[in-house]
Amino acid sequence: MLFSPPLQRATLIQRYKRFLADVITPDGTTLTLHCPNTGAMTGCATPGDTVWYSTSENTKRKYPHTWELTETQFGAFICVNTLRANQLTKEAIQENRLPALEGYNILKSEVKYGAERSRIDFMLQADFRPDCYIEVKSVTLAEKENGYFPDAITERGQKHLRELMGVAAAGHRAVVVFAVLHSAITRFSPARHIDIKYAQLLSEAQNKGVEVLAYKAELSAQKMELNEPVPITL
């Protein structure tokens, strides 16, 4: 995924009201960015960090600038735009960069499924193969080289795991993909210290046939690409 037009650089002043952030540009202008991330963003929103933002051509948007990346004072890149996780995963599947998800010729997005009336991020289909249901989660919480999900208690994430267990029980393929969007992370675990219920459900889901995958994105201010498998400890 190439950023076109190129991202612009600024310095973070503060994130507030969850969806907004004030930054100062190199010429001294203060801007308010849209922050497309509902999570705690622990370690991703430290005042003084470098922010990379995109600008929409939609003149009707109240906040035309979107916070895409954080470049920390320690040199790590973090993609804070959670919408990018799905885009990167879709691109990687279509370009056959995720071997575990190859061999399908149909990809559908936002398909309704499950007893709890959810929407799956992706469904893959092919002749003579079970349908493959894929839920994607964005991983940005880092403690040293360890990556964790979630960064706050997530009842929605718990629901998705229950739905995937139902998919597996029905004879379909069920997969959760953790898209690691932090350049310093080298391994992944569920955040048992934050949401014990989610961690327990993830282990239960794996035991009941749900596949748990983690891939790391190559990140820069110019492009992003999801391709590197990450070791998982449940």
Curated annotation (Swiss-Prot):
Q: DNA binding happens at which residues?
A: 201-220
Keyword DNA-binding applies? yes
Q: Does the keyword DNA-binding apply?
A: yes
Q: Per UniProt, what is one Pfam family of this protein?
A: SfsA
Q: Which GO terms describe its molecular function?
A: DNA binding
Q: So which domain of life are we looking at? A: Bacteria
- What UniProt keywords apply to this chain's record, in alphabetical order? DNA-binding
Task: Enumerate the HAMAP family for this protein.
Answer: SfsA
Biological function? Binds to DNA non-specifically. Could be a regulatory factor involved in maltose metabolism.
PANTHER family named among the record's database cross-references: SUGAR FERMENTATION STIMULATION PROTEIN A
Q: Which family does it belong to?
A: Belongs to the SfsA family.
- Protein name, please? Sugar fermentation stimulation protein A
Give the species this sequence originates from. Answer: Salmonella agona (strain SL483)
Read off the lineage from the record.
Bacteria, Pseudomonadati, Pseudomonadota, Gammaproteobacteria, Enterobacterales
